């Protein structure tokens, strides 16, 4: 009988939770894991993620006589391109569309005249107007660098020229570009 009491006592002790004997509670927490798996064919060259195209000073006289400024060249370059996932890439330019000039982006200004009097247009190296929201011709990916070359210019509206209301003073505009891999 003594043996059965000892066995019962040992069994009861073994069945008790280890937390019963702990002096303090064990504190824990949760973990969350997240991320994004991407399939980019290239890396944007440092400095080309956010471009600043500076027209410097544009003469209102030139806009009245020529209707547009001299073009400013710029490029968006990609490096570390691989054909493992994609074979080509296009680029799409976009921005707040000008209200009266198709394929021009609108400007904001703090000058003395209406900022709607001018807009900014993009061209390729052959001076062909680039349509906003339309992908460029595809460029083949290689193991080197891919470069998209553009030009931008400021153009005055015909009504601003006729009414002598071209914006004078500082102006700015925002545009975006999107890379589309195929």
Curated annotation (Swiss-Prot):
This is Putative minor fimbrial subunit PmfF. Transmembrane segments: none annotated. GO terms for biological process: cell adhesion involved in single-species biofilm formation. The gene is pmfF. GO terms for cellular component: pilus. Residues 1-22 form the signal peptide. Keywords: Fimbrium, Signal. Belongs to the fimbrial protein family. It is found in: Fimbrium. PANTHER family: FIMBRIAL SUBUNIT ELFA-RELATED, FIMBRIAL-LIKE PROTEIN. InterPro entries: Adhesion_dom_fimbrial, Adhesion_dom_fimbrial_sf, Adhesion_dom_sf, Bact_Fimbrial_Adh_Pro. Pfam families: Fimbrial (PF00419).
């Amino acid at each position: 009988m003594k043996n059965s009491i000892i066995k019962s006592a040992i069994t009861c002790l073994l069945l008790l939770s280890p937390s019963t004997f702990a002096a303090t509670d064990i504190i824990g927490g949760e973990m969350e894991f997240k991320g994004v798996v991407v399939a980019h064919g290239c890396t944007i060259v440092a400095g080309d993620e956010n471009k600043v195209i500076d027209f410097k000073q544009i003469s209102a006289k030139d806009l009245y006589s020529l209707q547009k400024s001299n073009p400013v060249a710029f490029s968006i370059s990609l490096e570390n391109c691989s054909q493992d996932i994609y074979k080509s890439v296009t680029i799409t330019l976009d921005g707040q569309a000008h209200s009266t000039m198709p394929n021009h982006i609108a400007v904001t200004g703090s000058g003395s005249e209406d900022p709607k009097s001018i807009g900014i247009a993009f061209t390729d190296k052959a001076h062909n107007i680039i349509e906003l929201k339309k992908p460029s011709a595809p460029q083949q990916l290689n193991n080197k660098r891919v470069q998209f070359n553009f030009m931008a210019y400021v153009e005055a509206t015909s009504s601003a020229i006729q009414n002598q209301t071209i914006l004078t003073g500082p102006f700015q505009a925002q545009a975006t570009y999107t890379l589309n891999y195929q």
